[in-house]
Amino acid sequence: MELARPRSNFQSDLDFCPDCGSVLPLPGIQDTVICSRCGFSIDVRDCEGKVVKTSVVFNKLGATIPLSVDEGPELQGPVIDRRCPRCGHEGMAYHTRQMRSADEGQTVFYTCINCKFQEKEDS
């Protein structure tokens, strides 16, 4: 006796697998479309009449406005008593970012408010 297959986990169109939600590949020359993640398969005839449209948007060269150094986030943080190794100025702004995995410490970026020299410290 064969067990009945449970109903799908997702309500979706044929772009996504109804079992795991992954994006299904485009139909090819095979008789079935098979989900590469969970192995769910549908008959390729179920995709009949489906239209796939793609578009690529190219931005004009030079269309973005570069930020000046004064506008970056590194100079908007708090200032601490830390001597710049390049110019010797006392006072550096800092900000933190999670650059490594979540179970490791953050990276602290220090920026000299005088000469804009930047250094980092892994904490």
From Swiss-Prot:
GO terms for biological process: DNA-templated transcription. GO terms for molecular function: DNA-directed RNA polymerase activity; nucleic acid binding; zinc ion binding. The keyword Ribonucleoprotein does not apply. InterPro entries: DNA-dir_RNA_pol-M_15_CS, Rpa12/Rpb9/Rpc10/TFS, Zn_ribbon_RPA12_C, Znf_TFIIS. A zinc finger (TFIIS-type) spans 80-120. Zn(2+) 1 binds at residues 17, 20, 35, 38. GO terms for cellular component: nucleoplasm; RNA polymerase I complex. Keywords: DNA-directed RNA polymerase, Metal-binding, Nucleus, Transcription, Zinc, Zinc-finger. Belongs to the archaeal RpoM/eukaryotic RPA12/RPB9/RPC11 RNA polymerase family. PANTHER family: DNA-DIRECTED RNA POLYMERASE (PTHR11239), DNA-DIRECTED RNA POLYMERASE I SUBUNIT RPA12 (PTHR11239:SF14). This is DNA-directed RNA polymerase I subunit RPA12. It comes from Mus musculus. The lineage of its organism: Eukaryota, Metazoa, Chordata, Craniata, Vertebrata.
